Curated annotation (Swiss-Prot):
PROSITE patterns: ATP_P_PHORIBOSYLTR. It comes from Escherichia coli O157:H7. Keywords: Amino-acid biosynthesis, ATP-binding, Cytoplasm, Glycosyltransferase, Histidine biosynthesis, Magnesium, Metal-binding, Nucleotide-binding, Transferase. Catalyzes the condensation of ATP and 5-phosphoribose 1-diphosphate to form N'-(5'-phosphoribosyl)-ATP (PR-ATP). Has a crucial role in the pathway because the rate of histidine biosynthesis seems to be controlled primarily by regulation of HisG enzymatic activity. GO terms for molecular function: ATP binding; ATP phosphoribosyltransferase activity; magnesium ion binding. This is ATP phosphoribosyltransferase. It catalyses: 1-(5-phospho-beta-D-ribosyl)-ATP + diphosphate = 5-phospho-alpha-D-ribose 1-diphosphate + ATP. It comes from the Bacteria. The keyword Acyltransferase does not apply. One of its GO terms (biological process) is L-histidine biosynthetic process. Pfam families: HisG (PF01634), HisG_C (PF08029).
Amino acid sequence: MTDNTRLRIAMQKSGRLSDDSRELLARCGIKINLHTQRLIAMAENMPIDILRVRDDDIPGLVMDGVVDLGIIGENVLEEELLNRRAQGEDPRYFTLRRLDFGGCRLSLATPVDDAWDGPLSLNGKRIATSYPHLLKRYLDQKGISFKSCLLNGSVEVAPRAGLADAICDLVSTGATLEANGLREVEVIYRSKACLIQRDGEMEESKQQLIDKLLTRIQGVIQARESKYIMMHAPTQRLDEVIALLPGAERPTILPLAGDQQRVAMHMVSSETLFWETMEKLKALGASSILVLPIEKMME
C-alpha cells in the first residue's frame, strides 16, 4: 500500500456486501484473487489495490484519505457522518454513485403484543440499536425523548433479554424479527450500497482510472437491469409491440424470408420483462419470443 500511483479501494471483507462487491469488481474486468485471507489484494491487470476491512471502518478510511474509494452501505456511511459531526469534525467525501445491491431498511420494531400508536409510543422508552446517531436524528425530529442501548450485534434479542423496550435495526425480509417475537413498525432510513471517493486532489492517472471504472460500473448495472429481446412480430402491430417494451433506442427490424406479414425484431428493453408482458406480446401476434440476459453493455 506504499505505492501512491495505485488506486486503493476499500470493501467489506465478509458480510452482507462482500459477495456483491466482489462480483461487481469482477464484472468490471478487474482480475484479483479475493479468495485468500490476505487483507490487501493486488489486481493482476490494473494498478488497483483492494483493502478488505470491516464495513464500519470503510467510511473513516475514505474520509481520512487512507484509501481513494470505498464500497459501503449508505446506512453505515450516514451513521459515521453523523458520529463525526457530533464530535465537531467536518468529514468530507464524494458519493460517486448508488449501486444496485445491498438494499435494506433501518426500522423500529417492538414486541408483537405491544400497542403501537406511532413513534410517540416510544417516548421515554429504552431502544437497542447499532445505529444510535441515525436513531437520535429521527426521533429528535419527531420531538421524542428516549434512552439508547448500544449493541453491536444480536440487537433483536434485547427486548426478550430485558435490555430494551424496542429495537432499531436493519431489516431485509423481517424473518429475524418474527423469529424473536418482534414486528416492524416504522422505517426510519432506506439504504443501498454506494461508491464513495475521498476528498482532495487526485493524481491524474488515478482520476482517469476512476472515470474508467465508473463507466464500467454503469455498464454492469445497465446490463443487469436490461434484457435482449428477439421475436417475430406482425408488421401491422409493430407500434403496439414496441410500446410494451421501452428501451434506450429504437428496435432493429429485419425482414423474414418468405413472410410479408411479419418481421424479426431485436431490441434491448430497459424494464424487467414479466410473464404478463410476454402474454400481451403473444396476444398481439408475436411469436418465437426470446428473452436473454446481457453480460456487458455500453451506450
